[in-house]
Design a protein with these regions (language model features):
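ABC family nucleotide-binding domain
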Residues: 2-4, 9-218
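Conserved beta-strand-loop-alpha-helix hinge in the C-terminal portion
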Residues: 222-247
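Short acidic DE-rich linear segments
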Residues: 255-256
Length: 256
């Protein structure tokens, strides 16, 4: 089932005086299936972060439509956007965005507190998520007492505890060492495989993208190519991704 639909999305930024325009996205169209793990790649300035911000409802497109499970984003009033994001979207950022004055437990539960979920239900949701992400022993610690990889696992727990329709991850391995990056990506793959989480991840890393089932390449605000994993393993998919990135940098056609 198509969970997310991006239809002819265009984004144009105009200077205050209206003298200069910058086209960040040019008629982008694609869909994300429910239960899919998809990565978006592209060079700096390609438009991938702009696209993610629009999908996250943090920005509005100049033209085009976005639908989440059939609901057009354009129908959500500005004053209702925070509630819409909290109920439908989970976020994982490069810099964790945990509150240092809150324990790991309280950071994870914060979205549920804002939604006024009963305490018993919050605890019932927390335990299986903490167990899956191996952070049960960290719940009473504070962010400054744990490692970067552990912080990011807590951030993932915060993203999934609301049972969002889709998880949006922006360079989630960018602040992690190689070991923590692999652990995080394995957790993403497990959440996708065992829980059915739909994940859309923006990344510069071919290694990170190799954990996805599909990779979309963006260049100069347009879709350049896409790759499907198929039956190959991570290593084979990584090699194909690197080949496409090479062609992308040279401006050639999709090599498949």
């Amino acid at each position: 089932m198509e969970l997310l639909q991006i239809q002819n999305v265009k984004k144009v930024y105009t200077t205050k005086l209206g003298l200069t325009q910058c086209v960040a996205l040019k008629n982008i169209s694609f869909t994300v299936q429910e239960g899919e793990f998809m990565a978006i790649m592209g060079a700096s300035g390609s438009g991938k972060t702009t696209l993610l911000n629009i999908i996250a409802s943090l920005d509005r497109p100049t033209a085009g439509q976005i639908f989440l499970n059939g609901t057009p984003f354009s129908s959500v009033r500005d004053r209702d956007l925070a509630k819409f994001r909290r109920e439908n979207l989970g976020f994982v950022f490069q810099e964790f965005n945990l509150l240092d004055t809150f324990s790991i437990r309280d950071n994870i539960l914060l979205p549920l507190v804002l939604s006024q979920v009963p305490v018993k239900e919050m605890e019932a949701r927390l335990q299986p998520v903490a167990k899956m992400l191996d952070i049960t022993t960290l719940l009473d610690k504070f962010p400054y007492e744990v490692s970067g990889g552990e912080k990011q696992r807590a951030a993932v727990a915060r993203a999934v505890i609301t049972d969002p329709q889709i998880i949006l991850a922006d360079e989630p391995t960018g602040a992690l060492d190689s070991r923590s990056s692999v652990e995080l990506l394995q957790n993403f793959a497990r959440l996708n495989r065992e829980v059915g989480c739909t994940i859309l991840m923006v990344t510069h890393s071919a290694m990170a993208a190799s954990y996805a089932s599909r990779v979309l390449f963006i260049k100069d605000g347009e879709i350049f190519a896409q790759l499907y994993r198929g039956d190959g393993d991570n290593r084979a998919f990584f090699d194909r991704i690197v080949s496409n990135l090479s062609v992308l940098s040279e401006g050639g056609a999709d090599v498949g």
